[in-house]
């Protein structure tokens, strides 16, 4: 069938030294490829599966790109996931939160709720950001801090409703909560000079979404 053909093509490309990415909605294809990989390719393979007891982490706010670009790309993913219920206030708050965390340099997606609800943590993140960008993020956080507690809860409620189904799940927090995961996507696209190193970077990435175990929204976020 189609899965058998896809597995054959992926293995063929891997054997030929090409970079391979397989995103599998069900997980069966990833399992098939992983069990058939030649031994010499195993060290160059990353299997991303949120169902693992100790999953490989993904930090979309870090890894080989500018903080602002990382924040914008992740914002676009959330906007596409929740297009039917996306509003300007949610856009504004999430954008400022992602930018602030990405510019921090050691943050993760799982910190967004903490940033919005914990004053002490928020000050530790936004202090330097406000100084460096007083007209942009500085103005946003000044507005946010000026809100009453009730106004703040009302403002962030739509965003928190979107984040909770993902970040309340332990296996997804284990994936998105790693600030410095061992694998970053930019490693897959490193130049050929890096491939000549004694420890070559990953060339094969197998992503098991397993929608039945993760849920639609979580699987879409992981796949994006």
Where are the regions that the model predicts?
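Conserved lysine of the Walker
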Residues: 2
């Amino acid at each position: 069938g189609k899965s058998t053909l896809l597995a054959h093509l992926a293995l063929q490309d891997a054997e030929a030294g090409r970079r391979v990415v397989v995103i599998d909605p069900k997980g069966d294809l990833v399992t098939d490829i992983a069990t058939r990989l030649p031994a010499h390719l195993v060290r160059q393979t990353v299997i991303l599966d949120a169902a693992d007891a100790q999953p490989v982490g993904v930090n979309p706010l870090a890894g080989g790109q500018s903080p602002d670009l990382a924040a914008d790309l992740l914002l676009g993913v959330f906007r596409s996931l929740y297009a039917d219920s996306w509003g300007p206030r949610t856009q504004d708050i999430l954008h400022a939160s992602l930018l602030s965390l990405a510019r921090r340099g050691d943050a993760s997606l799982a910190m967004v709720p903490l940033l919005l609800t914990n004053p002490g943590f928020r000050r530790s993140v936004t202090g330097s950001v406000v100084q460096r960008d007083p007209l942009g993020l500085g103005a946003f956080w000044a507005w946010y801090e000026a809100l009453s507690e009730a106004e703040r809860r009302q403002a962030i409620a739509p965003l928190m409703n979107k984040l909770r189904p993902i970040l309340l799940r332990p296996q997804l927090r284990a994936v998105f909560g790693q600030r410095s995961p061992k694998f970053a996507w930019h490693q897959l696209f490193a130049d050929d000079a890096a491939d000549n190193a004694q420890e070559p970077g990953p060339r094969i990435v197998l992503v098991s979404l397993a929608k039945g175990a993760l849920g639609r929204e979580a699987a879409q976020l992981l796949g994006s």
